[in-house]
């Protein structure tokens, strides 16, 4: 190797080192998944009267009793683990679990069938997917329709990160199609293999005098997983795309299009739909970040039992 080639090699290494040194990562609060709130809920006698454990990402603490949960310790994380009170009956659902990983913990998100037996006779079966997201749930859940309205989706956020970074592991159910199981009638087939989803959206929101919320899409990152991993994938880094990305080769209409199905709590304390009305310019500053990890895709009551997504060490890259 000549002197010129040696010099160029050193210059390249120096450039790479400088670029790496300039990269900044910020762990989301409680994003290391090492700290959890554990709740003990007593279900109604008519459905068995069992004590059930629910997990929430937050400060290490145990809560005993059928009390509505509000995020503790400044935790930005909500889960699909909920307590419901419908027609005077208290019932729980837990799809997100605290699981040991090395010297700490991670989150395990599962899709399963929640089975309820009333007076030991009537069976009600509902498909439930694991969801870990930035925001919170409004408890208790008081109805079986339009479950999204209980979710306050997104948190205030005004930065412009380059990427989302996290550790993950995925186990597919192996089924070629999904099912829809609402608790009323039997299950139906939904064509297409189930996928886990990781979604980060940056939005510039606006609330009108009536409390309605609209948003322009500032940043977009959506990845899906349908093949099992043999082991943990550490430091998965997913680029955030800014502005109108519809002509980008990375744009996937099905998962990245503008959304109108999410809810957020307005200034009046009411959960209302967030309607994305367009794409912001690529240099716009957001007001909110939406981040969700999901063990299944396709909407409420849809998925494949057995789909499992593990998540740990959630960071933003600048």
Where are these regions (language model features)?
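Extended, low-complexity, turn-rich repeat/linker tracts enriched in Gly/Pro/Ser/Thr and Asp/Glu
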Residues: 170-177, 188-193
């Amino acid at each position: 190797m000549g002197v010129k080639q040696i010099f160029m090699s050193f210059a390249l290494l120096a450039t790479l080192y400088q670029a790496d040194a300039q990269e900044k990562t910020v762990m989301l609060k409680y994003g290391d998944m090492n700290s959890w709130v554990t709740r003990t809920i007593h279900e109604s006698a008519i459905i068995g009267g069992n004590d059930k454990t629910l997990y929430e990402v937050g400060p290490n603490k145990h809560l005993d009793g059928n009390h509505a949960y509000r995020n503790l310790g400044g935790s930005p994380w909500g889960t699909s683990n909920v307590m419901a009170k419908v027609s005077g009956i208290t019932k729980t659902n837990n799809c997100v679990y605290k699981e040991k990983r090395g010297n700490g913990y991670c989150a395990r998100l599962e899709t399963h069938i929640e089975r309820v037996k009333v007076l030991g006779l009537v069976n009600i079966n509902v498909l439930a997917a694991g969801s870990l997201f930035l925001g919170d749930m409004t408890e208790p859940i008081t109805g079986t329709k339009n479950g999204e309205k209980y979710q306050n989706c997104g948190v205030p956020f005004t930065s412009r990160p380059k990427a989302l970074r996290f550790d993950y592991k995925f186990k597919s159910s192996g089924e070629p199609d999904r099912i829809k199981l609402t608790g009323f009638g039997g299950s139906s087939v939904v064509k297409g293999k189930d996928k886990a989803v990781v979604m980060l959206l940056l939005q510039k929101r606006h609330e009108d005098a009536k409390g309605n919320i609209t948003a322009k899409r500032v940043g977009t990152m959506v990845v899906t997983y349908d093949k099992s991993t043999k082991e943990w994938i550490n430091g998965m880094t997913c680029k955030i795309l800014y502005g109108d990305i519809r002509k980008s080769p990375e744009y996937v209409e099905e998962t990245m299009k503008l959304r109108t199905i999410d809810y957020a709590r307005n200034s009046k304390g009411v959960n209302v739909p967030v309607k994305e009305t367009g794409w912001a310019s690529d240099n716009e500053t957001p007001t909110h970040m939406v981040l969700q990890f999901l063990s299944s895709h396709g909407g409420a009551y849809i998925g494949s039992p057995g789909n499992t997504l593990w998540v740990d060490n959630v960071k933003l890259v600048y």
